[in-house]
Amino acid sequence: MASLKDLRNRIASVKATQKITKAMQMVAAAKLRRAQNAAENARPYAERMAAVLGNLATNLTPGAETPRLLAGTGADRVHLLVVCTAERGLCGAFNSSIARLARDHARRLVAEGKTVKIICVGKKGYDILRREFRDQIVELIELRGVRQLGFENAEAVTENLLNRFEAGEFDIATLFYSRFRSVIAQVPTAQQIIPAEISPASESAQTDAAYEYEPEEGEILAALLPKNLTVQILRALLENAASEQGARMSAMDSATRNAGEMIKKQTLVYNRTRQAMITKELIEIISGAEAL
């Protein structure tokens, strides 16, 4: 049985931990609102950009050369996985769920005889994936010092991908991130970004609006596709940021409540132990008095 001193130390330790988890929960809640607004504001822009590109691709002049970012290399040998996770932990299953989706995808590709390369955006994804795919990880992009994600962060990732694509380092690139739905619901998502997966414009959209393009559609597509890549990456980073704070807020709330339950149980054990010791001392005193 633990001594009273051990029990007091244990209770004090849990109380200190509870203060930390409560503080982290409050910080995550404060960051969540800003991150959620940024993610929700980015969605319509990214969706509209994809719609514009779909319209352009549908109306591409017959015989015109399709940009490589849309047509691809024509091969399916080398796959690049861009895995976006957090720089820190203590956010539940947020990091592990994204890494698991990427890991399963990589395993399928390897089983099919494809070559897999991985770029990790965020330290936690790198820590998880390097256990199995150390040789496949070609780069780690850390965002530890970034206080607020912006267009320049997405542009840096885009430039990296475009340089590798032009150098012929991969054929297909897939982006992995967590789509934010609510504080308790984040959905790990895989999105092919090179070549771009663009839905063609619907027949009604083509009928309702007839556009004349200057310059031609192919030139506009070639100019917009790199920007669309940046927009999709920025959206993924913002969705990830909101998902991370939501997961951390939920995890720290659960940890705080669990700490409270543990404090109650340990306090009960402490009181029972103390009561047993007092009772034992009284019995010893009474027994000694009777012996006299």
From Swiss-Prot:
Keyword match Ion transport: yes
Compartments in which it is found: Cell inner membrane
Biological process terms in GO annotation: proton motive force-driven plasma membrane ATP synthesis
Gene Ontology terms for molecular function: ATP binding; proton-transporting ATP synthase activity, rotational mechanism
Protein's UniProt keywords contain Transport: yes
Main location: membrane
GO CC annotation terms, alphabetical: plasma membrane; proton-transporting ATP synthase complex
Matches recorded under SUPFAM superfamilies: ATP synthase (F1-ATPase), gamma subunit (SSF52943)
InterPro entries xref list: ATP_synth_F1_ATPase_gsu (IPR035968), ATP_synth_F1_gsu (IPR000131), ATP_synth_F1_gsu_CS (IPR023632)
Keywords carried by this UniProt record: ATP synthesis, Cell inner membrane, Cell membrane, CF(1), Hydrogen ion transport, Ion transport, Membrane, Transport
Topology within the bilayer: Peripheral membrane protein
Function: Produces ATP from ADP in the presence of a proton gradient across the membrane. The gamma chain is believed to be important in regulating ATPase activity and the flow of protons through the CF(0) complex.
Family the entry assigns: Belongs to the ATPase gamma chain family.
Quaternary structure and partners: F-type ATPases have 2 components, CF(1) - the catalytic core - and CF(0) - the membrane proton channel. CF(1) has five subunits: alpha(3), beta(3), gamma(1), delta(1), epsilon(1). CF(0) has three main subunits: a, b and c.
NCBIfam families xref list: ATPsyn_F1gamma, PRK05621.1-4
PANTHER family named among the record's database cross-references: ATP SYNTHASE GAMMA CHAIN, ATP SYNTHASE SUBUNIT GAMMA, MITOCHONDRIAL
HAMAP family: ATP_synth_gamma_bact
Name of the protein this chain belongs to: ATP synthase gamma chain
Organism: Methylobacterium nodulans (strain LMG 21967 / CNCM I-2342 / ORS 2060)
